[in-house]
Amino acid sequence: TIDDTVIGDGVKIDNLCHIAHNVVIGNNSCVVANSAICGSAIIGKEVYIAPCSVIRNQIKVEDGAVIGMGAGVTKDIPQDTVNMGFPARTIRVRNEEDWRIY
């Protein structure tokens, strides 16, 4: 089914981004240039999606995750992790110092 796309408070969306039907983007997330979020994906709060990334349909990206530049997300992404590559893989878990920078 095609439902509403919901974009939370404080979300920043850069130019040339594609956000499909039934997508939910949590508060204070950031979607940077030329990224695509396919249908029925759920993006948590305070998620950073770098340029030229693609998030496949029906994927869940948990709160605080980082998606690196050009990543292709084909599986659910755990909370507070840094993910890169094509297909995207978890590189590491974010630490307290990362949060101060972000």
Give residue ranges: language-model regions.
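Structural signal for interior beta-strand "rungs" in well-ordered beta-sheet cores
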Residues: 1-84, 88-90
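Terminal amphipathic alpha-helical/low-complexity segments used for targeting or macromolecular assembly
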Residues: 86-102
